[in-house]
Each structure stands twice: as structure tokens, then as C-alpha cells.
């Protein structure tokens, strides 16, 4: 209601490129969505709110077959290709950014939510098929690429992508496993640390709930609590010789606004500093400096 889906799609394409194509189209004023990938035509009696299923389907198939010369020839000869045969070129197009799928979803009435989940399960690359993370071993110009394989039997490589301060369990590191299997009894090193920590409680976050699990493998996102050495962008591993492993550094925006603060009561400087450091742990874009002259 009050949304212009055609205009919204046009804005997305203007910002991110013509590779952004809809996998479905809204219908009935946003009451439902119509699949445009597996279906070349709309169901009987259904008309999308803008464009047409035929046009969207044709654009998707043409975009996907462009990455495979064999399918290009078939498409030119036959006029269409069954999308069920395009699993490999579709994944390639997604990995290379040649196709950026757009799915319409309504938070108001839930339209398109089930279809979005179906798209994620059926069409998007799984961890074994997606783009591998850019791990590096070594420092500076001497760093060499390190390929992480989504193999549960290999040694562990995991990346900490978020730090939170939970009011009940304290500092919590959330990480994605890229290689190997982590269990409750795993002994993991944090970066170049020489002393491992025992996982103990391996958690999966489901909303505000923390669900303990016995193990997790490649592609899964888990969390552990009360490991002070764990920081944003840390690499977790279970082999002592796997030192100096890190991911390609991210470019964070430079802060553009600064503010000076001080505690209301004398003697609370250290307490305030500790709180600010916790915020810095959670947000890598935040910078805190302590001016010695003014404390």
C-alpha cells in the first residue's frame, strides 16, 4: 500500500546496475507474488501489478545463459531454455554478480516471504558452491592466498564477524565456519594466540534465544561467550601452526562526527572508558580517543 514497485525496481537498477532483475512480481496490489523464473507465463487470471511474467522470465533466462556459450546457442535456436537445466549457469551468474536477484516481499501482510525462502533454498549457491572467503596467510606483501574448503573433515577455519555484549552471558563472538567442524570440546586458537580456549557452550542464535548445539560445520553461524581475546575480524583455528591467517581487510567509512564526553562524577573515568571500549568492540566504525591532558 502506497508503494510503487515499478519505481522501486527502477531505483534499484539505477543504483546497482541492470543486473538487478526480479525473480517474481507483485500481484493483487501486493497481496501475493508471481514467480517469473520457473514459470514463463502467469497463472490463468493473474496479472502482475507492473510489467509481465513473460517479459521478466525472458530477461532472467537471457541474463543467465550469457555466462555459458552452450546455452546461448540453445537459446538462440530454441527461443527458450527450461530453467531447471540452468542450475550451474545460474549459480555462476550469481557468484560473478552477472545476475542480482530481486524478490518482492511485504512486511505488512507476509506476501512473498515463503517464496523468498524457497528461492534461497532452491536457487542460491550453498556454502560449497559460493564464492570462498579471501583468506590470506602471512603479512604485508609476503601474504599468500589461502583457500578454505567447505570440508567438515579438515581443520577448522572460522571468521568472527560480530561482537556483542549480552547482558546475561557477557561478551559474545559470532562467527561463521568456513572449514572443519566445531564441537563443544573443540580447542580453538584466536588469531596468533598461543593458548587455545575450549568452546564449552556452542550456541546458535535464534532471535533473542541462544540455542546450544553439539557441533557445527562449514557454512553455519555460531557463537561462543566469555572469550576476551576474541575481537571483530578474528580468525579461529584449531591448528597451532596456522598462524598469521586473516581475511582481506574491509574498508570502513571514516567517522565524520566527533563528540567529547566526560563522566559526571570524578573517579568514574575508568568505568566510562571500559564501557566505550565495549562499544568499539561491537562497532568497528566507532573510534574512541582518550586525551591525556583533559583525561
Q: Which residues are covered by each model-predicted region?
A:
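Structural and coupling elements of P-loop NTPases
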Residues: 1-295
Amino acid at each position: 500500500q502506497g508503494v510503487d514497485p515499478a519505481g522501486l525496481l527502477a531505483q534499484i537498477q539505477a543504483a546497482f546496475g541492470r543486473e538487478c532483475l526480479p525473480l517474481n512480481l507483485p500481484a493483487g496490489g501486493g497481496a501475493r507474488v508471481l514467480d517469473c523464473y520457473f514459470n514463463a507465463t502467469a497463472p490463468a487470471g493473474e496479472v502482475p501489478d507492473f510489467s509481465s511474467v513473460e517479459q521478466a522470465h525472458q530477461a532472467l533466462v537471457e541474463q543467465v545463459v550469457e555466462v555459458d556459450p552452450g546455452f546461448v546457442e540453445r537459446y538462440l535456436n530454441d527461443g527458450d531454455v527450461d530453467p531447471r537445466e540452468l542450475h550451474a549457469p545460474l549459480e555462476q551468474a550469481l557468484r560473478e554478480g552477472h545476475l542480482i536477484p530481486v524478490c518482492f516481499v511485504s512486511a505488512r501482510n507476509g506476501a512473498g516471504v515463503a517464496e523468498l525462502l524457497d528461492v534461497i533454498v532452491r536457487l542460491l549457491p550453498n556454502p560449497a558452491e559460493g564464492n570462498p572467503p579471501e583468506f590470506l596467510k602471512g603479512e604485508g606483501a609476503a601474504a599468500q592466498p589461502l583457500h578454505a574448503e567447505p570440508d567438515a573433515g579438515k581443520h577448522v577455519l572460522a571468521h568472527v564477524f560480530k561482537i556483542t555484549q549480552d547482558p546475561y552471558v557477557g561478551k559474545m563472538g559470532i562467527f561463521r565456519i568456513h572449514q572443519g567442524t566445531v564441537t563443544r570440546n573443540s580447542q580453538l586458537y584466536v588469531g596468533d594466540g598461543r593458548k587455545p580456549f575450549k568452546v564449552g557452550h556452542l550456541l546458535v542464535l535464534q532471535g533473542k534465544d541462544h540455542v546450544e548445539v553439539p557441533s557445527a560445520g562449514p557454512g553455519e553461524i555460531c557463537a561462543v561467550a566469555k572469550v576476551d581475546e576474541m575481537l571483530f575480524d578474528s580468525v579461529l583455528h584449531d591448528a597451532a601452526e596456522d598462524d598469521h591467517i586473516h581475511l582481506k581487510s574491509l574498508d570502513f567509512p571514516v567517522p565524520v562526527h566527533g563528540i567529547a564526553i566526560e563522566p559526571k562524577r570524578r573517579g568514574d573515568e575508568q568505568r566510562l572508558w571500559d564501557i566505550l571500549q565495549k562499544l568499539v568492540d561491537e562497532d568497528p566504525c566507532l573510534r574512541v580517543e582518550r586525551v591525556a591532558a583533559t583525561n
